[in-house]
């Protein structure tokens, strides 16, 4: 299960990053800034990234809990054993400042424990991905997922980001 959904999460993060960058790099964009109930900013990039991610993740059997999505009561959410947890644009204030310090965050969580995690830094084109069975990795220079992508290809093109996973990576002959 894990590997299939890792690719779904990576694809969603990369496509959301593309949406975000199209707004971020537009010198005429005012970002259409609004304020949420807690007075934190919300931009058109937040909203578009949310729609992009939700559209992709809605094709899976798991519900999506997103910072920018509709807020469901805890009584509904507490019965979800497996769910996606998403922050489509983490670092909205940094996005507004145009300092490049923002990410797209997606996790698949089962019984409160993350089993897949993806963090994408669109400006730097850096993707961090992790899974319980595969370890944690960093992939640089990525903007799209190739049609013939496999877990082995993704891992081989990446750098392990934890010592435990570095040893597993070396054992597979990827270093």
Where are these regions (language model features)?
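N-terminal subdomain of lithium-sensitive/metallo-dependent phosphomonoesterases centered on the IMPase/IPPase/PAP
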Residues: 1-86
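DPxDG-like acidic metal-binding loop motif
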Residues: 77-137
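Residues that mark the start of a beta-strand
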Residues: 83, 153-158
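Short hydrophobic/aromatic-rich beta-strand segments that constitute the beta-sheet cores
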Residues: 136-139, 158
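Conserved beta-loop-beta connector loops within the AMP-binding
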Residues: 142-155
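Active-site rim beta-loop-alpha module in soluble metabolic enzymes
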Residues: 159-163
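Conserved small/polar residues in nucleotide/adenosyl-binding loops
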Residues: 164-173
């Amino acid at each position: 299960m894990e590997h299939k959904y890792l690719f779904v999460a990576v694809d969603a993060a990369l496509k959301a990053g593309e949406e975000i960058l199209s707004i971020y790099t537009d010198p005429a964009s005012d970002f259409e800034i609004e304020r949420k109930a807690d007075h934190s900013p919300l931009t058109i990039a937040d909203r578009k990234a949310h729609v992009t991610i939700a559209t992709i993740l809605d094709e899976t059997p798991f519900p999506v809990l997103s910072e920018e999505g509709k807020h469901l009561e805890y009584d509904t959410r507490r019965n979800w054993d497996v769910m996606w947890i998403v922050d489509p644009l983490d670092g909205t204030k940094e996005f507004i400042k145009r300092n490049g310090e923002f990410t797209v965050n997606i996790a698949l969580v089962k019984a409160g424990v993350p089993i897949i995690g993806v963090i994408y830094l669109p400006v730097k084109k850096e993707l961090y991905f992790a899974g319980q069975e595969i370890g944690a990795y960093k992939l640089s220079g990525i903007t799209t997922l190739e049609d013939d992508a496999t877990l082995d290809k993704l891992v081989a093109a990446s750098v392990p980001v934890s010592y435990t996973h570095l040893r597993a990576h070396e054992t597979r002959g990827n270093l």
